[in-house]
Amino acid sequence: MVQKQYRASPVILVMVLLCTASSFAEAQAESSDETVAHGKALVEAADCGSCHTADPAKPFAGGKRIDTPFGAIYSPNLTPDRETGIGAWRDEDFHRALRYGVRRDGSRYYPAFPYPNFTKMVRDDLLAIRAYLATLTPFSNEAPPPALHWPLNYRVVMRVWNWLFFKPGILVPDQQKSTEWNRGRYLVEGAAHCGACHTPKNLFGADKKNRPLGGGLVQGWFAPRLDGAERSGLKSWSADDIVEYLQSGRNGHSNADGLMAEVVANSTSKMSDADVRAIAVYLKDFPPGAAEPAVTPPPPTEMTAGAAVYAHACVSCHETDGSGAPRIYPPLPGNANLQSADPSSALRIILDGAQTLTTPRAPNTGSMPAYAGKFSDQEIADVTNYIRNSWGNAAPPVTASQVAKARKRQ
């Protein structure tokens, strides 16, 4: 039997190839769009914009001054400008920066850039971030060089720091925990880098490994404990309370102020419901951590003096019993931030005043005037001690000298 051989028509072959190429291009475009959207969500979770935007008209163009205990650094340009941004970077350059804290020229970043957290993220997520940043409007903006104290002004010193305190590696899921819990951990310890502010640091600016999420001082604000501590942690907050706070900037316990207000506005209020819920689930499972310090109440004379200042300046909004107007003027009894061992945030708010953050979920607002020019250091100390030790609250005493130091940070 003779077998007939068939030869495909050139026209048909071209049509098949064109259709295949078209389908592949469409699939690739869809994948690219999906990757960019995923990267955008991660950039928002990481709150990149807060540190890398100095001029709101030039988002992500860097140049923002960030003060640290070791001097000042300036955030770099993340836009795709080829000369001053990351437009000329390869994927491997970007991956190496976030995974290992290594700059394109081979020198080391300073850990104010939270690569100790980003190292825990999977490669695909890191490159999704790059994919999104590549879609931004490029701006030419060269950040100033760091202004750090000797010897940290030499980046080579960071090799020693990394050897002592940095362990690169992707976070391994805990198979004994739920998918939601593991997602929350990935965000808290990785992308959202909560510990960069909420974990106390040692003398070299590295996390104290024995006190994760135990509260930390950042640019004159105290980022409170996120562990299960009874007075100054999240023990009294439910998962729903945490979700409401992260999405709106307020709940029945507290309002977001200072740097945390930026985080809510630029990051957590934009995250998906599922991711915010995952963070809440993880944090509610976090152990109490270090014991809270025993507190000796202030002398009755100081409490009486503080009560007089409170009656004069605070009672009209916060009420005699401290109940306030929840979600506008936060309640003072049981307020974890107010009872933190470090009073820095309370002093900043009393001295500088506060404006309630508005978000799509909480558009109404309230304000608190600044009292720096109205009361003496001792009067500020008295009223701070009063609200930190009334209505069942308990916190270490604040002195007039602490208030004086807080004034200098204004």
Enumerate the predicted regions with their spans.
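Short, solvent-exposed loop/turn and secondary-structure capping segments
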Residues: 53-54, 59-64, 106-109, 140-147, ...
